[in-house]
Regions:
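Post-His helix in hydrolase/transferase enzymes
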Residues: 52, 187-202
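Short, hydrophobic alpha-helical segments
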Residues: 61, 65, 196-209
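Typically the conserved alpha-helix immediately C-terminal to a functionally engaged Cys/Sec
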Residues: 25-26
Length: 295
């Protein structure tokens, strides 16, 4: 008779990848009695559509949870792997009570900027259509019920070289940024292992902090249809568009492709947020900016 595991650990790889690195991460974190589940989606299949990948992981998860209905669950998702699990958990709230923790490593919850540039009209070009979706509302709902940790790498003061740091954040999750780690390194790195292990020692729900002025302004901009978090590297190119009474400024830079990039700066001129909207949502952006300017 098989011994019941003390934990089920689901660890899911992401786009343009296989399971090997994140399986090693899970093995490093596991107790001797843990049951590891690390589905290999296949490198090539991760380039096409996300729906079959979600269905694959969902089938494996259903079989595992049916086999061990009372075993606590720990979930780790790297990059697109985190997005896959967001979609699965959104479809299966009946599993939430069993999940002890949810760890998202370098997952573009707000939408990947590279994906939005590839698929600016959201028509579903390959995997870009799925990676460019803003899933913050889903993530925030889950984080209210499941202890959630977000880990991001910051190698160039804004991204891990692939995923924008700001795109990984959402209200209700514990957030940890690791300097000088690239996207691929985050799949299995001693620092990441240490952070997850510390979180697992005391997994608790993170109560959202009251929104200050800056957070409210950024949240309002992020709520604009089509707004995608962007790297702040183009901040020096921007010009003040709205100067608020408290000295904060909203700045704009229009790229050579006529894409509007928006920035929020404090009175000291430091960039606090950067994002962009495509041609399709330019009108919505300027409508909100007009409302902010008239307040």
């Amino acid at each position: 008779m098989n011994q019941t595991p003390d934990f089920i650990i689901f660890a899911q790889h992401g786009w343009a990848d296989t399971h090997h690195a994140i399986a090693a991460l899970a093995k490093n974190l596991a107790t001797p009695q843990s049951h590891l589940v690390t589905p290999n989606l296949g490198w090539l299949k991760t380039w096409w559509r996300i729906e079959p990948l979600i269905q694959h992981v969902e089938r494996v998860a259903t079989e595992t949870i049916t086999q061990y209905p009372d075993t606590p669950i720990r979930i780790i998702g790297h990059s697109m792997g985190g997005l896959i699990w967001l979609e699965i958990l959104n479809q299966h709230p009946e599993w939430w009570y069993q999940i002890e923790s949810f760890v998202l490593v370098a997952s573009p919850i707000g939408g990947a900027d590279l994906a939005r540039l590839i698929d600016p009209f959201s028509v579903g070009i390959g995997m870009a259509g799925a990676l460019g979706i803003n899933r913050r509302q889903i993530a925030q709902s889950i984080a209210k019920k499941i202890p959630t940790l977000v880990i991001a790498g910051d190698r160039d003061r804004g991204s891990d070289g692939t995923i924008i740091v700001e795109s990984t954040k959402f209200s209700g999750a514990k957030f940890v940024s690791i300097p000088n780690l690239a996207h691929a390194q985050l799949k299995n790195h001693p620092t990441v292992i240490g952070i997850i292990r510390e979180f697992w020692a005391n997994p608790t729900i993170t109560n959202p902090y009251p929104l200050d002025f800056t957070a409210q302004l950024i949240e309002r901009l992020q709520s604009i249809p089509g707004m995608t978090d962007a790297h702040p590297r183009d901040f020096p190119r921007s010009q003040p568009y709205i100067t608020l009474a408290n000295g904060f400024t909203i700045r704009i830079w229009t790229s050579p492709l006529h894409v509007d990039h928006i920035f929020v700066a404090n009175p000291e001129g430091e960039c606090l947020y950067s994002g962009f909207v495509g041609w399709r949502h330019r009108g919505a952006l300027h409508q909100v900016l007009a409302e902010i300017g008239n307040q």
